[in-house]
Amino acid sequence: MVANGHFAGVGDVLDAKNYEHGVQVIDEEKEFNPNLSNYLSYENVTPAGFNYHLISVFGSQSTGKSTLLNSLFGTHFSVMSETERRQTTKGIWLSKNKRLKSDKGQDNQTKMADNILVMDVEGTDGRERGEDQDFERKSALFALATSEVLIVNIWEHQVGLYQGANMGLLKTVFEVNLELFLKDKRSNPRSLLFFVIRDFLGTTPLQNLQNTLLQDLNRIWNSLSKPAGLENSSITDYFDFAFAGLPHKNFQPEKFVDEVRKLSTRFCDGHRDPNKTDAKGTSSIEGGIFLPEYHRRIPADGFAVYAEGIWDQIVNNKDLDLPTQQELLAQFRCDEISREVLVAFDEAISPFEAKQAEAVQAGNPQVLGGLGSAMCNARMKSVKNFDTEASRYHKRVYQMKKSELQDKIDSRLKALFLGQLSAAHRSGIQEFTESVTAAVKAGQKRGASYDFAEIVTKERKLAIEKFEKEARAAVVEDTQWSNYQQELSLYQKDLENIGGQLRRDEMRRLATRVGRWVRSRLGESIDLEFNAIGSGRGGSGAPEFGDKPSEKSLWDRVWTLFVDTVLDAERRFTERASSFDASIDEVDVGLWRLRRKSWGVLRAKIEEEMMEGNILLKLRENFEDKFRYDDAGVPRIWRPNDDIESIYTRARESTLTLIPLLSRFRLAETNAPPPLDKWIGHTPSSATPADEEDLTPIGGVDEDEGKSLEEEMTMIGEAKKQDLTVRFKKTADGVYVEAKRSAIGGITQVPLYFYGLLLALGWNEIVAVLRNPAYFLLLFVCAVTAYVTYQLNLWGPIIKMTEAASQQALMEGKRRLREFLEASDTGLQAMAMSEGRNAEEYDMSNMKNRKSAGGFQNNRSHIDDADDDDDF
């Protein structure tokens, strides 16, 4: 599109060539240029905020409006050729002031205001549009809605005329101003009508021309049809007026330039002097012509959007509502600023969100270092940047959008904050558990007593301090969600629960250690008691200290020993549990479990002693001690005249009485089972299912077990008793037969004639010995030695020593024989053949031994596993 006859509309390229003549805001086809914002950015107006001013110029076509602007503001609007009369400016053009300062020739030179934007509006009354006044009205409405100052360019000789003085255009301006004011009831926007009278000769004073124009303007205002409530309004309620005269540009060029320079000094910030008022009480303007009340309060970065919205309403013949447009602009710009702010916010926060999400996905939340400061800085910068850019817009919309932005930011920061607290919570619990466990193990390794409650209290304090430190570091000031007291309370509660669980675990380990001690003590003591059953001897065969205990009081001794051992264990448990800060209920549960577990240990030990092989062996030993030894504990040497049958019967019957005695756990004093149910006691009210799940049911104590106390105390059933009786009798019968044979063998082994034959054949030797003093003395010494050895019961040790010496001599002889054979080839061959046969025999025997040993090991492993599984 060719504009103004010689240059095209501005594109997207930001360069001086495209913007030499400014930017065409609206073309002659009433299309708005979307590149207005690019031009404002190019001219560095966008960051100015409210520090900019907008001036529009009105006037008839070909009256020198563009020439005036170019001279006054240094712009380069296209001007009409001197050789032809035609339309030059089409649509509405905009350019930034290029003349920053007035000429320096004056002493009171005044700097022009920054960022003055000048709009060159298409002239009125042109032949190109003819009677079509639609664009004239729309452009006037657009200029009035956006501009602070409206420059009316007229010639001096047109003052007093209606069309020539643009009174028709001004009537349009007044009408659209009333439309705007009718919509905007919250404020009273004012504008400045600045009449620049061209070709001013000075013949008619400027004041007279001013009065004429004001009279015409008041007449036009009074002729307007005003909305309800504004019938008595005055033109000065909405407009201020200023006047200036300029000489002819061609006939008085030097004076024209000088007056333009003077006029430019008025385009700066001014103020009203309350001490100087006119007849209507309006304060006079001092300084420049730009008053704050003229400004439309549209930030520079939103002007392009605002202007486009205004023009869209105008061109579509919709009622122009400036407050609504300002709110729409505020919403648009605040959303745009919010998006820009969130981009920078994302760059600062997204890495932390990614790290946190990755750690959570991996199942190992981590406390992120520097998160708190990063969140504070990101939030502060985001809100500050938003305030800087958006606070210039509509206050209500700005506050609403700021609240929305803060909600978006805070929702993400809150998620990070809670994730940080969750990670600190989890890591703190883990570190607390590990620290307490490590401290307990260290105390156990040192072998010294340690105070578990003190360890838990110390580590809990450190854990809470660390959590609070990490929580404070993640706090974002001035946010409600940064209060971490609820999370801290939950963390403290979890620490209490974990501490309680660790205390319960430690008490279980304590109970296990005490239980092992009980197992060891009971194992040794019960072994001694049951081993005493296998010894039926008295006298020299009795125990080393004291008399042989009564077999009838076996269970009394076992029960007393059991109760004393467990009482000692309870004392140890209670003393150690006091350092755990355990409650009375927890100690009661621990003692109750200890008693039940201890009974299980005793029951298992008794069952082990009552195994068929063990009990049968003890019965045989008891019988043999009573049968083979006399009341003094001396072994019996059976002779044919001994009453073996009666001795056998007494010993057998005495031993048989042990079977019913051992079959039931009964106290001799009461002839009743021990009070196990009262001794164990009722289940504590504080006991949990977890405390009971690993306990073995006890008859007479647990009602759900279905067994009575009598059944619980039955150690050998009736069937097993009968089997033991039968097998024991068979064993006793074998011992009796052996004794009987021994007695009979002593008679038949040496016939009587043997002694006569021995005397007859050995008479010479007897006489020789008796006559020879040396032989007689040797015989006497040997006889005395043999007698003494017999009296001291040393024949057995002497025989064993002799056998050991002979075995040692045999082994030494074999070794020397092997050394001799290894020295010759023949011997080596013989040894090789012998070793081959021995290897085969060894393999066969080894397989048998492995089977036998395997069975033993399996039994042993079973017993060991049972011991290891018996925990408290």
From Swiss-Prot:
GO cellular component terms, A-Z: endoplasmic reticulum membrane
GO MF annotation, one: GTPase activity
Transmembrane segments: 750-770, 774-794
EC number: 3.6.5.-
Membrane-topology annotation of the record: Multi-pass membrane protein
Binding site for GTP: G59, S60, Q61, S62, T63, G64, K65, S66
A Pfam family recorded for this sequence: Sey1_3HB
Coiled coil: 482-504
General function of this protein: Cooperates with the reticulon proteins and tubule-shaping DP1 family proteins to generate and maintain the structure of the tubular endoplasmic reticulum network. Has GTPase activity, which is required for its function in ER organization.
Family per similarity comment: Belongs to the TRAFAC class dynamin-like GTPase superfamily. GB1/RHD3 GTPase family. RHD3 subfamily.
The protein's name in its UniProt record: Protein SEY1
